Amino acid sequence: MSNRLKGKRSFVTAAAAGIGRACAVAFAREGASVFATDIDENALITLKSEGIAEVARLDARDTAAVNATAKRVGKVDILLNAAGFVHHGTVLQCSDEDFDFSFDLNVKSMHRTIRAFLPSMLEGGGGSIVNIASAAGVFKAAPNRYVYGATKAAVAALTRSVAADFITRGIRCNCICPGTIETPSMLQRAAAAGPGGREMFVSRQPMERLGTAQEIAALAVYLASDESAFTTGVAHLIDGGWTL
């Protein structure tokens, strides 16, 4: 621990597993107090029992719940938006319901949390917002990621807009664009692809391995810390060379 986030208060969505959880753990190790949320409350228990974070169930698609949670938590210095869903398919496999759900969870959830927490961040003199986007859709089109890619491109645009609107008021807003990261949800998709599914994902990687959630969390710590004080409105690519 180097206490790069000492004295800072952070709020993390989708913290029960994968990238969100890794970020919550990394923030705590760097000295931040962490309020971790997820729709799966049971999966948050170890974060609380290990003294890593205060936890609460939160459906990031529920505006009233987001607002109530923000009121309960109060002012934060760091907002990490990690909630998201990967829809598999082309435009022909994407129903109106699929489209609406993907945008609601992947984009509008960030709109909700930013609207809920930004006023107190402004009152407190500033803060850092970090949104999890993706290499897919922002830097490169990926097969069968039609609506997923569209939502992540929207996240990058949302990020730049927030950064531009509040740059003179102490708010920094950046997004992280991971490549293929080994998380529980990614392993579920690999299993659904059948035997050799994980190996198929690995074969697409120039570095011949998958990324780790901890590698994404390390970048999130940097963006949350004062070390990145001159950085805002940027989509940070961390993909093991996938887009080369």
Residue ranges and their predicted role:
Residues 90-91, 95-103, 197, 201:
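Substrate-binding pocket helix/loop in short-chain dehydrogenase/reductase
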Residues 119, 164-168, 229:
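Alpha-helical segment proximal to the catalytic Tyr-Lys
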